[in-house]
Amino acid sequence: MEKEEIDNTPTPHNSGRKGDFAKVCLMPGDPLRAKFIAENFLENPVQVNGVRGMLGYTGIYRGVKISVMGSGMGMPSIGIYATELFKFYGVEKIIRVGSCGGYDPELKVFDTLIVQSASTNSNWAKQYELPGDYSATPDFQTMIDAYETAKKLGIPTKAADVLSEDNFYNDVNPEGWKKWTS
């Protein structure tokens, strides 16, 4: 007996339907940045999500179907949206785009980073019962493609390790960031 496929769309966090999202989805944190990307870089963008103000669009970029959707702030927020995109909407690759803060005094505003690993002080990943601490790394080919594309376009890049935190303001240990940069 064949297992019946259940269409779990829309979800409580996404009004899109199966097929509304491309295989590749760009994810800035800010939903208004997603709107900007859609309106300025995609041909014929269609808004596919607006639940809770988290804007998502699908359109065409250089002949390729691409989606872009905000993720919100923090791992719990991107965790919800990314999980649903992968699990229910057929997205195969999410590329995080957007801004970030920095602890390294050599990094400047508007520097383009090619992230090679992402550490965290969050306990969000504990639910997966991985042994030890987990430092997420990108798909190697995607990272190389991003680097090569930036190089071809003359965009200087910096390889970087990043830290994602659950808190934006750390009043408890304001100097704690120094340990992450040593």
Model-derived segments and their meaning:
Residues 137-182:
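Active-site rim beta-loop-alpha module in soluble metabolic enzymes
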